[in-house]
Amino acid sequence: MIRKKKKVKKIRGSRTCGGGSHKKRRGAGNKGGRGMAGGHKHKWTWIIKYCPDYFGKYGFKRHPSLVKRLETINVGELEEIVLKNPDKFEKEDDKFVVDVIELGYEKVLGKGKVTIPMIVKAVEVSEKAREKIEAVGGEVVEL
């Protein structure tokens, strides 16, 4: 049921407006601080019970210079590029020669279908991509 009047209208005039004892509702001091204040002090048992993973670090953090990040392209996308612009790619024994590095990529991944034979030159090639390229009579050259 929807109230026609706000509850505060009824409560007005009473000392605490429905808040119980006047000592309650006194602000953050009444709660032991705002938010996670006291997490290492008086709220420690609450942290242990309800948020046990709140503090601490887990796992390994590698230095950014050690992480090798290669630009990737899928075999299906590579074929689409070749089919859209066939005159841009050289042909060698009826196979398109695709230098992935010239296209701005380094690694070839195996998502998609391959229907035309290609000679793919790349820094790295995944196993699935290699299988798909060689299944239609293509070759893979790792640089």
Swiss-Prot record:
Organism ancestry: Archaea, Methanobacteriati, Methanobacteriota, Methanomada group, Methanococci
Quaternary structure (record):
Part of the 50S ribosomal subunit.
Alphabetical list of HAMAP family matching this protein: Ribosomal_uL15
Which protein, by its recorded name, is this? Answer: Large ribosomal subunit protein uL15
- Entry keyword Zinc: no
* InterPro entries for this protein: Rbsml_uL15_N, Ribosomal_uL15, Ribosomal_uL15/eL18, Ribosomal_uL15/eL18_sf, Ribosomal_uL15_CS
Q: Which domain of life is it from?
A: Archaea
Which keywords belong to this entry?
A: Ribonucleoprotein, Ribosomal protein, RNA-binding, rRNA-binding
Q: What is one Pfam family matched by this protein? A: Ribosomal_L27A
Give me the segments passing through the membrane.
Answer: none
Ranges of Basic residues composition bias in the record: 1-13
Q: Name one GO cellular component term.
A: large ribosomal subunit
Q: What does this protein's UniProt record list under function?
A: Binds to the 23S rRNA.
Q: Show the ranges annotated as biased composition (Gly residues).
A: 29-38
For biological process, the GO terms are: translation
Keyword Secreted listed? The answer is: no
Q: Which family does it belong to?
A: Belongs to the universal ribosomal protein uL15 family.
Task: State the residue spans of region: Disordered.
Answer: 1-39
GO molecular function (one): structural constituent of ribosome
